[in-house]
Regions:
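Glycine-rich, acidic/polar active-site loops that bind/position phosphate-bearing ligands
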Residues: 1-168
């Protein structure tokens, strides 16, 4: 256990901490990516991860989408994914489902939109809370985002920078 500050007996000063804690608020900006495919390996001879998003710039030259429909070239450009609308934003419906589910677990949401990275970066902001509850809110947020993406056959990740050369 940490030692009390010099000249302070064990437990003194704690009411002061609680008094300040009531007036502190926190709401992290937990941006995430939605990917259509994720592969990884960590074995004795190799380590890698590979991600793919149908809206990513590197998919502008593919012949067909994953569902077999023709590629009609609505793809984001590198660092140009901020707030696109469909058909470039392929994730709007899934993000709307995430918003609905986050509201069901009690988070008060402020905004949601596609973020700067072209390959599926998302942002859903929720209202700040006390320090006591902010950690719980973040865990609920991440759980709902992961589960909603998985139910849609996608992968959500909170990795800080999964795409080289793009925002994260």
């Amino acid at each position: 256990l940490p030692r009390p500050a010099s000249g302070c007996r064990q437990g003194r000063g704690l009411p002061e901490v609680h008094r300040h804690r009531r007036h502190r608020f926190l709401a992290p900006e937990a941006e995430f990516f939605i990917f259509d495919k994720v592969r990884f390996e960590n074995s004795m001879q190799r380590s890698f991860y590979e991600v793919d998003s149908i809206e990513a710039p590197w998919n502008s030259g593919i012949d067909t989408e994953d569902d077999g429909t023709p590629n009609i070239a609505f793809k984001n450009r590198v660092k140009k994914g901020y707030f696109p609308v469909p058909p470039i934003d392929h994730t709007q419906d899934l993000r709307d489902d995430m918003v609905a589910n986050l509201q069901k677990v009690g988070l008060i949401l402020e905004r949601s939109h596609h973020e700067v990275a072209g390959a599926g970066q998302q942002e859903i902001n929720y209202r700040f809370n006390s320090l006591q509850h902010a950690g719980d809110d973040l865990m609920k947020y991440k759980y709902v985002v992961h589960e909603t993406a998985a139910l849609a056959g996608k992968a959500a990740t909170f990795m800080p920078k999964p795409i080289a050369g793009d925002n994260g």
